[in-house]
Structures are given as structure tokens and as C-alpha cells.
Amino acid sequence: MQISVVWTINARTASVDRAIENLAEIAEEGFTRVWCTQMPNEPDALTMLTVAGWEVPEIEFGTSVLPMQVQHPMLLAQRALTTNAVIGPRLHLGLGLSHQVVTEGMWGVSYKKPIQRTNEYLDGLLPLLRGEKVNSGGDLITTRGSLTMDDIDVPPVYLAALGPKMLGIAGSRTSGTVTWMTGPKTLRDHIVPTLRAAAVGAGRAESDVRTVAMLPVSVTDNVDGARAAAGEQFAMYNNLPSYKAMLDREGFTGPADAAIIGDESTVAEQIRQLGEFGVDEFVGILFDRDAEVRARTRALLRTLHP
């Protein structure tokens, strides 16, 4: 199982120069991939990772996740291929539907028919990434045309899929799923088998799809303090239906329970267990604000990285 970390590009807490310095430090420590979140009020992840990837050539990038509703498939294909044209074949393109409170409340875009929207989006995006011409006239999304962007490596596409229908799309059409706030039992009993079954049902191999599990992590002796901090920082996810469903399915009382917290042996055992349950890549979000705790956490993750 690959071990990665989230690369923070929040402009409120770090300048662009400092973000790039932080990325270089992560690469020097031996990590081979970072994942970038995309919040609706933060810097554009693709732009940031393209600039940073030019400066730091030793590391790959994943996006977790770019919202589909605010960019047409042709625009996203242009942006993703441009990124790989600049930094080489290092982009892993994670997409998602965001959340109703964001799409309708902030953007004024309907959240209705999410499964149909996802399929129609991929009908346009995937062929364009492969350099093919598209003629897709959907009820929600129409994509017609082609790009003049040849000889550029095609980025693997992942979906933020948690429910069975979205996992079916991810398994049959993409490189896999990126999960968040999803515990070990749910990964073992729901996410991994549903994704792999969809791949096989589409005539693919189970190994053609990957489960990327993103969770908060902290190596610390102050377990209660870290758990309280996680509960405070990630409280909003208890109010988002897709994540609340995963927390409830696991039997968690809230987002704090999803965090992996403890000393080195405790955290290492929980992360290794994810690999035994079929997770292909663990992505740690280092949420503790104490620099020593963050360094200790990254030091452990380095020992787990193959």
C-alpha cells in the first residue's frame, strides 16, 4: 500500500513560496505523491500544483477533488492535459460532485440527477483526455469537439465515490475512488468490494481500479487532546450527507472517531490494517497544529511507505 500525505496550499496560512518549500521538504523525505484538496474558497489546486510541479520534479500529485459542476468537461480536459504538458505524467485527476449546500447554495447549480450528471461528464471528459473526438449530447451536459493537444500523457481519473451507484461508475469507467471520512470496516465491507465488483462486471480486472483512502492522522501521546482537535477541525463533515452516511455506517459518533490517533505502534497498526482490507493508497491529513507532532507523524508515515 502506498503512503501519501496531503499537501496544503491554503493561501491564508502559507504563501506560494512557502507551499513550494513545504512540497520540496515532503519530496526530500521520500514521499512520492501528495494529494491536494480543493475547497471552494481556496487557491485553484491545478494551477498551484502545476507551478509547484515545475519547481519540484520528484513527486506526483493527486487532486481530491475537483468539482465537476463548475467546469465543463472540455475545459477540465484542457487544464489537466496542460498540467501534464508542463510537469510530465504526474497528475492523478480526482473528481467529485461536491455537496448540495455548495453547488446550490454557493454556485446556484442544481444537485439533481448526480448519477446521470457524472456519467454524462465522463462521456465528454474521458475521450478528450485520450485525444479522441467527442460527440456527446446529454440531457445535462453536452460535449462536442476535440482538443489539439497531442502526445501528452493521459492522467488517471478517480471519482469521489462512496455510494453503490457512484462506486459502480468508478469501478466500471475510471481508475478508482478517493474516500474521506470512511472507516476501516466500511472500506473492507463496502467500498473495496463494490468498486472491484463493478470493475469485473465491466470486463476489467480488479487490479485496474484503486481505492485511495484519505483520513486525518496524528502520532501523539496526547490522544484525548488530538481527538478533541479533530472533532473541532472536521465538525462540518458531520453535516454533509455523503460523509455522515459513511460515519454512521462505521458506527462513528462523529468525524473525530475517523481520525487515526495514537503512538507509533497504534497508528502504524491501524494504517497497515487498511492495506489488509484492500486499500491501495493511504493519504494522511496531518491536522495537529503542533510542529513536533506533525514531524513525528510524517516520520512514522515515511517508515510505512514502501
Regions found by a protein language model. Give the residues of each.
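Active-site-adjacent structural elements that line small-molecule/cofactor binding pockets in enzymes
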Residues: 1-306
